[in-house]
A protein has these predicted regions:
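Alpha-helical junction/boundary sensor with strong preference for TPR arrays
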Residues: 300, 340-344
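Active-site nucleotide-donor binding segment shared across nucleotidyl transfer reactions
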Residues: 10-43, 47-53, 201
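Residue-level signature for tetratricopeptide repeat
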Residues: 319-322, 363
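Conserved catalytic core of two-metal-ion nucleotidyltransferases
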Residues: 1-14, 56-128, 132-229, 236-276, ...
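Generic helix N-cap/helix-start motif at coil->alpha-helix transitions
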Residues: 307-313, 352-355
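Alpha-helical repeat scaffolds
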Residues: 293-297, 328-339, 369-380
Length: 380
């Protein structure tokens, strides 16, 4: 199914003289003769930003039966700056993110090869707005820090003013306009969890390769393309074993409309599932916070026990220090050194006894352990 969609994309691109490239994973399969990936989400091609917009317009002008092209221009819950070319007579639905696509069928994602924006300021503003939009679409997985909350609030206000669909389309147009600067020396592939930077020369030319009997297009400099994506040993890269997610429903025989009908009140089901997913995400955050607190309690207990141990050795340590036996003191302070390292990672000092602490700091200087000594100096 994905292969047939790739062939259709190839046909549309050749007819309209649009350049495209198979994703690094599919290119590796074609070049090294690996089997086609089983994961239905691995159908990916890349296009330069301007070419991606031309492709969108070409499909809109000549739509095909049982096919849909989705983007932020057409769907107010579309979560990112890319396109998705879908077979609407199939089913590929993530039950935890039911709003992602208006047509949740098996499809091919078309990701843009972006150029950096004309200025650093514009780049930061675009990145801020794009991240805020993505987090609004997947609120259960959003960052919880102050800056992210502020950015999401601003995006919500903009959605209230222009409407959610209007804001999505406006953001898409901005990204298209600013991410296709002429004369750029690099292209950026931005995915949800990974960003890859390619030299522009890699995409200067293309060539045809065979993938599962179908002729498709990849960058002419295939070796460089795959080396950046997988490293020098890309030929040894293995396809990860695919295990279907519990939340993913996939079928090439049943359409998403049939699935919705058989599910009864699907809208109600989606709302309940999203509500439960929100509760689960909240409980996970509480659990993480509890685990963090418990780890800190254990750390404090460990530190207290060690301080009691050194309190018992205090006279012995003072005698060694008086006799300037720094070799023995270094050995005695090894557990103290490790505990100090852990404390410094938390921006704290292990200084339960000031007298022992002063001796320890002097021993650090005498034994040449200047790195930890300088870190302690910044906190004193």
């Amino acid at each position: 199914m994905i292969l047939s969609l790739l062939q259709e994309i190839d046909e549309i691109c050749r007819r309209n003289k649009i350049e495209y490239y198979l994703s690094p994973r599919l290119t590796l399969c074609a070049v090294e003769g690996h089997p086609f990936p089983q994961n239905p989400m691995f159908g990916v091609v890349l296009m330069k930003t301007a070419d991606m917009e031309r492709f969108r317009l070409a499909v809109d002008e000549d739509p095909r039966e049982k096919r849909a092209l989705e983007s932020m221009k057409s769907h107010k819950w579309f979560s990112g700056f890319y396109l998705r070319y879908t077979n609407t007579d199939t089913l590929c639905l993530n039950l935890d993110n039911t709003r992602d696509y208006a047509f949740p069928g098996i499809g091919v994602s078309i990701f843009p090869l972006r150029t950096p924006a004309a200025s650093v300021k514009a780049e930061r503003r675009l990145s801020r707005d794009e991240n805020a939009w993505t987090e609004l679409c997947h609120i259960n997985h959003a960052e919880r820090n102050f800056r992210s909350r502020v950015n999401r609030t601003i995006m919500r206000l903009q959605c209230m003013i222009t409407g959610r669909q209007g804001q999505a389309a406006h953001l898409y147009d901005r990204l298209v306009r600013f991410c296709q600067q002429p004369g750029a020396n690099k292209y950026i592939l931005k995915r949800r969890k990974q960003t890859t930077v390619f030299p522009a020369e890699i995409f200067a030319e293309s060539k045809r390769v065979t993938l599962e009997g179908a002729e498709l297009q990849v960058p002419a400099k295939t070796a460089e393309y795959l080396t950046i994506s997988y490293g020098k040993n890309y030929k040894d890269a293995k396809e990860p074993r695919y295990v279907t997610s519990i939340a993913l429903v996939v079928s090439a025989r049943v359409s998403y409309t049939q699935f919705w009908k058989e599910s009864g009140n699907f809208e109600k089901y989606c709302k309940e599932r999203m509500k439960n997913a929100r509760k689960l995400a909240r409980s996970r955050r509480h659990k993480d916070y509890f685990n963090e607190c418990w780890d800190y309690v254990e750390f404090c207990g460990e530190r207290m026990n060690l301080s009691v141990s050194y309190e018992k050795q205090k006279d012995y340590i003072k005698n060694l220090y008086k006799n300037e036996d720094y070799m023995t003191l270094e050995r005695v302070f090894r557990p103290y050194f490790k505990m100090m390292q852990k404390s410094l990672q938390k921006n704290e000092l292990f200084a339960e006894d000031e007298e022992i602490f002063d001796i320890y700091v002097d021993v650090l200087e005498k034994t040449g352990k200047t790195v930890q000594r300088s870190k302690i100096g910044t906190l004193i």
